[in-house]
Amino acid sequence: MAIDPLHTGERTSLFRRMRVDTRPLRRRDYRNLWIGQAISTVGGEIGTVAVPYQVYTLTHSTALVGLLGLASLIPLLVVPLVGGAIADALDRRAVLLRTETGMAVVAALFLANALLAHPRVWALFVLQGIAVSIFSLGRPAMSSLTPRLVPNEEIAAAAALTSVYNSLAAVGGPAVGGILIAAAGVPWTYGIDLVTYTASFFVIWLLPKMPPLGEVDRPSLRAILDGFRFLKGRQPLIGIFAVDTAAMVFGMPTALFPAIALHQLQGDAATVGYLYAAPYSGAFLGSLVSGWTSHVRRMGVGVTIAACVWGAAIAAFGFTTSLWPAMFFLAIAGGADFFSAVLRSTMLMRVTPDHLLGRLQGIEFMQVASAPSLGDLEAGVLASLTSLRFSVVSGGVLCIVGCIATALALPKFLRYDAREPAA
């Protein structure tokens, strides 16, 4: 059979545009940052299983396990804003080195507590709050390093590469943690966590110094408020926050996964795990074909479409009655959320000047971390008043309505062109 070289070339070109864009990894400093954060993220995800498992086995109280979420939520609402102000005022590499050191120390304390004959439950709560606080303090500095390490045309590719290890760690980390606990015991998970944070420290140490550029504001309440003031009138930034909030508040039914798995899908505990893993699996698969995101010009349109696909997939998930269709639609939702996150992150980094980027990253992290909790609350309350199916389906529909309303109310967000990054 004759092969058409023209069509073969077109297919090759399409494949290159679709596959994950690895150009940023050719740059040594970005590669070191990526490796360091990938190591610590995987270790952190492995460790996430250990704390709730230990609390439950020591107390046999699901209420106390639930309170761990409160110990995490309070720092997530405050500390990222402080971390953003610090990232804009100090050397960002130095901030990361200190936070990685702090995370390693906390992992060592978790390990020491686990090795006691009678581990202290109160210590688990205190250390969990400290760990989340330190992580939230360093996250804005880490997120705001990318524009200093790659050119504008590679920012979308860098954002996609970050999501590669995030999604892979979210799927594999807890599974590895569970296997480790079953095979070797809880202390091993904390030990691996300690090793990964230590390794991450030495990789980040290889980065060049990252002092502030331009004007420097000392970390203060005024500096934090300046970040919020910068948002005023900048529709591209307001739009990315509003669309993601609509998607997470209305279309985030993860709190209902146990009930859906057991009652609507007639499954068991394993089914619950599959539902939690499905969106991250979709995100990982999406990351493998994310090369096209570097060529998107109308990013506001892209964010809106991706968020609407998320809402539609969640609504479809609400109608499912068996596992495989449920996982399929959740994977579609996860892939859509991945593409939305890449485009939102790219817009944020391109629109925001470097001297404010840490603070805007702090605001973004606070929003991303807290909105799903509101979504769980909305889904749970509505399901208790109506039904599981109505809560999920109506949430997906409201997500679509909210995203379209945002796009119509913020025309500059919808018209944002990547060739003109200034807000």
Task: Describe each model-derived feature in a short phrase.
Residues 2-423:
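Alpha-helical transmembrane-bundle signature of multi-pass membrane transport and export proteins
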